[in-house]
A protein has these predicted regions:
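Basic- and hydrophobic-enriched, low-structure N-terminal and domain-boundary segments
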Residues: 1-212, 216, 221, 547-549, ...
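Hydrophobic alpha-helical segments involved in membrane association or supramolecular assembly
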Residues: 77-79, 442, 446, 517, ...
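P-loop NTPase motor domains
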Residues: 150, 195-487, 503, 567-588, ...
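A glycine-rich phosphate-binding loop feature that marks nucleotide/adenosyl-phosphate handling sites
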Residues: 158, 408-413, 548-551
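N-terminal short leaders/motifs
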Residues: 171-190, 369-382, 517, 523-524
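Conserved ATP-driven motor cores of ASCE-family P-loop NTPases powering translocation/secretion/packaging/pilus
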Residues: 479-481, 485-488, 492-582
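N-terminal charged/capping segments associated with class I S-adenosyl-L-methionine
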Residues: 592-596
Length: 669
């Protein structure tokens, strides 16, 4: 330890000596080039004069005003290089360069002062002042360099460098792929890359708070690319007609991807003119009573979201069973002539004294309705009325002439991926009426899912925007089985807590854990934590610095830490996404995780939108004189359905009364 201290003291003496010689050279420069003024001040040192004359004669030291200055600065630099000062966090390269620049200008660029037309004493004073000030500035800059903290840990306070990583830069295209161009940050610069969804059949989730760019950056691109590649498509358009307009116009402009050009269909309850008609409980697509039960189950849980958490409860199952029985009754009555959703609602709203004799007169429904009959026969009228009211009250909210119009006839079937008749179907909701329309549209969802998830059909896509606004029965099963049937599912919603609230904890977990492709814009809370855990950890550098008077000690270690921490996900800007994709056996993607900006050509999109055509009028309600009769025709359809149900009930009661084996049912009133 003593030897080390001696060495340090010796080094300090050498540095001091070099600095002293440097200062002497500066003084010599002033003495030589301002000699006239010095003599005027009465300074006459003959020995110094002779020494300087010898230096100049032998070495040419004073042939130029710069020589002594250059030697002085060289010795000053050596003295600063060997000096170890106390490190300071406030010393920056900016301060150092400022001091050095000022010193250089004052020290080297002041020769013109000697030629100023001023008194000799003034010129000498000014020259000496600039040389001295410049030297001090150079000295300060040199000393600050020795005190500079070379590892400033505060340069990356958000740990961006550790949490940036190389991402996929290849474009991997295939018959089914979706490809999104990106920009990502890695090693202090922005790079171009690609998100390659090479297997869309393993389902995709698009998350993000409102305004994070879900639809703009991801969902819209999926719709366009899948239409270009010949997918049949079902689009749930929560804010009709945003997505529907894109799908309609892109199909008009890119029909070349299809062997058989698909037809474009729209379900829109707000405007019957721009809506096709479709019966979601068409008898041809119901094979047994379980299909009727699924339809009743879907409609009831969409009307009563709280029932999702209470499945199996008595007052949840009772109205579902009753409504399923009515649907199946309409299926078997006159070969399903009146099997529509509006007819089922109207039938339910008849007196229960009329409903039960009619339903139980059919052997297929007798056992199905035995709990209701037991309550009726047992005198539990209040319980029975409560069960019926549990079905009537929510369904009565759906009594609407426009809704009856759309759902009471069929202009197309829901097998959208039929190779012989492919379809692009867009169903539109309205945020102001989402509870009512969402229930009806949920019925279309459940029927479509069952019809498209079959072997040998055309590749198809199911795109659901704002998933929590409808209850999508069978969603978990669709995700799990759709891959083998070439059904690409894309679900958009805001965060996982919405899914848990509206689908229940178990079903929400199945959805979250079975999707293969996930995109997330800004999300917070538990959703951000869940995603961060899904993306995993990476080995990151950790550096610590200890500063004392004599030295700086640095330690570097590594530890596993979150690749994309929740705080990063919570602070994503609009258009920035994190996520992961799945790959195939023959299309390997080494880096599946991404943290990037999805690049959207805004100018191109604006040009496309300007050229978009509105969805045309589908049904013309004009009469022979050109007058718009939409309201009259829609109301006439509404009255017709009510009258048909009244007539059905009257005819059925008459049939039962005339049948010796059944008329006892009427006596139970």
């Amino acid at each position: 330890m003593s030897q080390q201290e001696d060495d340090l003291r010796a080094l300090a003496k050498i540095m001091d000596f070099l600095r002293a010689v440097s200062i002497i050279l500066v003084v010599m420069n002033v003495y030589w080039f301002c000699y006239e003024a010095i003599r005027l001040w009465g300074v006459d040192i003959g020995v110094v004069d002779r020494i300087l004359m010898n230096f100049n004669r032998t070495a040419g030291l004073f042939h130029s005003i710069l020589y002594t200055k250059l030697f002085a600065v060289l010795l000053l630099a050596l003295s600063c290089l060997g000096t170890k000062g106390v490190k300071g966090e406030k010393i920056t390269w900016g301060r150092i360069w400022t001091a050095l620049a000022a010193g250089f200008v004052l020290f080297f660029l002041n020769w013109w002062i000697l030629a100023l037309p001023l008194p000799v004493e003034a010129v000498t004073g000014l020259y000496a002042l600039t040389v001295g000030t410049g030297y001090v500035c150079l000295l300060m800059g040199g000393l600050w360099m020795s005190r500079l903290l070379k590892h400033n840990l505060m340069d990356d306070v958000f740990n961006n460098e550790n949490e940036s990583f190389m991402q996929e830069t290849r474009l991997i295209e295939s018959e089914y792929s979706g490809n999104l161009p990106t920009r990502f940050y890695y090693r202090k610069r922005w790079n171009n890359g690609w998100i390659n969804v090479v297997n869309p059949f393993r389902a995709s989730i698009v998350l993000g708070t409102p305004g994070s760019g879900k639809s703009y950056a991801v969902v819209n691109s999926f719709i366009k690319q899948q239409i270009e590649k010949g997918f049949s498509m079902y689009v749930y358009d929560f804010k009709f007609s945003d997505l529907s307009t894109i799908a309609y116009n892109h199909l008009l402009n890119h029909p070349e991807g299809y062997k058989v050009k698909p037809k474009f269909y729209v379900i829109n309850f707000d405007d019957p003119r721009r809506s096709h008609r479709c019966n979601p409980i068409h008898p041809d697509f119901m094979e047994d009573i379980t299909d009727a039960y699924e339809s009743a189950y879907t409609i009831m849980l969409n009307l009563n979201k709280s029932w999702v958490q209470k499945q199996g409860d008595f007052f949840v199952e009772s109205p579902i069973i009753l409504f399923a029985a009515i649907i199946w009754y309409l299926k078997i009555f006159q070969n399903g002539k009146y099997c529509t959703f509006p007819h089922a609602i109207e039938f339910l709203n008849r007196r229960y004294e009329d409903i039960f004799p009619i339903l139980t007169s059919y052997p297929e429904l007798e056992n199905y309705l035995s709990p209701f009959m037991d309550a009726w026969l047992g005198g539990a009228a209040e319980q029975l009325m409560g069960q019926i009211a549990s079905a009537k009250i929510p369904l009565s909210r759906m009594i609407s002439p426009q809704l009856y119009w759309v759902m009471s006839d069929s202009e197309f079937t829901l097998d959208i991926n039929n190779p012989e008749e492919p379809k692009i179907l867009c169903v539109g909701n309205n945020p102001d009426r989402q509870n009512i329309y969402g229930a009806a549209l949920g019925l279309y969802n459940s029927r479509i899912v069952k019809l498209i998830n079959k072997k040998g059909m055309l590749k198809s896509s199911v795109i659901i925007d704002e998933l929590p606004t409808i209850y999508f029965k069978g969603l978990d099963n669709l995700i799990a089985t759709a891959r083998s049937n070439k059904v690409a599912v894309c679900l958009g919603f805001q965060d996982f807590s919405q899914l848990v609230r509206d689908y229940g904890d178990r079903e929400a977990k199945v959805v979250m854990n079975t999707v293969g492709n996930i995109f997330s814009g800004q999300v917070v809370g538990e959703t951000a934590k869940t995603l961060s855990e899904r993306f995993g950890k990476v080995l990151q550098k950790r550096q610590s610095i200890s500063i004392n008077r004599q030295d700086v000690s640095t330690s570097i270690n590594t530890q596993m830490d979150a690749l994309i921490p929740p705080s990063k996900i919570s602070g994503l800007t609009q258009g920035m996404f994190v996520g992961s994709v799945s790959d195939n056996f023959n299309e390997r993607i080494k880096q599946k995780i991404f943290h990037c900006e999805i690049v959207v050509d805004a100018e191109k999109m604006k040009r496309e939108e300007k050229a978009y055509k509105p969805i045309p009028v589908i049904t013309d309600f004009a009469d022979a004189n050109g007058n718009d009769c939409m309201k009259e025709m829609v109301k006439a359809n509404y009255r017709r359905i009510k009258e048909e149900v009244k007539q059905i009930v009257a005819d059925e009661l008459e049939r039962i009364a005339g049948d010796e084996n059944l008329k006892h049912l009427l006596q139970q009133k």
